[in-house]
Amino acid sequence: MKIKEGYMPFHEYKTYYRIVGEPSADKAPLLIHGGPGSSHNYFELMDDYAETGRQLIMYDQVGCGKSSLPEDPGVYVKETWAEELVALRKFLHLDELHMLGQSWGGMLEMYYLTSFDPQGIKSVMIDGSPASIKLWVQEQHRLIKYLSYEDRAAIAEAERTGDFTNVKYLAANDRYMEKYCWDDPDENSPEPLRRPTNGKRASLIAEGPNEFTENGTISDFDVTDQLHKIHVPVLVTSGTDDLCTPLIAKSVVDHIPGAKWHLFANSRHLALLDQHDEFIHVLDQWLAAND
């Protein structure tokens, strides 16, 4: 299978991109990773899908993965990543495309669609993404209530003191993420998941120390009242055991005209991992219906 890798100049930085498969009449989906501070790595688990004849395009947002890792904290704002998305479409001549954004990637999609009125978007898949960080934080604190008393106490103490280095807090947060997000990669995990994402700085500056203490540059993110501007086909996806709770997903669906929703049973924040075959099937059916 053909894989093309390269870099796009972006200001004084560079953005890594990866294209899997050959061009065809079927429009390629642009895969937008989460975080902020993750990388394209987990999307490599979709490489086999390109063998169906549909090319896949993925990239590392600046501050992540194989892209430049600026020390300037002013880089790590939604405006930078939206500008980068605009530039990448132009650089790769993506005049017509589908888009799939996972977690923060879906938030970036929503911001891009409501602020830039882009043309040539065949369809959009928003996977596990909130339109409002305020609602996200509220729901994370509700999910915390399902943890043990000891873990709840450790998290509450960390939030009260601002000390997110205590070993009890770190262990509690690990269990929280394993319950609602994904399993921490180990030696048995697929190779792409074991690779570093290099996005710690981006994550701390843009998001904060964890999923429920959002005090970074995107802490005021809320495009809920702008979602009515989206007039392309949209599929929202989420899991039953997801950081992106059904309430969060529904708040997106309810505000986008004509949006559809697929809820993955027994799935946490990455249905691509927890329900891989179903995820690929849902994606394939969605893209085919909107080519």
Swiss-Prot record:
The active site is at 103 (nucleophile), 242, 269 (proton donor). Residues 30-274 form the AB hydrolase-1 domain. The keyword Transcription does not apply. One of its GO terms (molecular function) is aminopeptidase activity. Keywords: Aminopeptidase, Hydrolase, Protease. Releases the N-terminal proline from various substrates. PANTHER family: HYDROLASE, PUTATIVE (AFU_ORTHOLOGUE AFUA_2G14860)-RELATED, MONOACYLGLYCEROL LIPASE. This is Proline iminopeptidase.
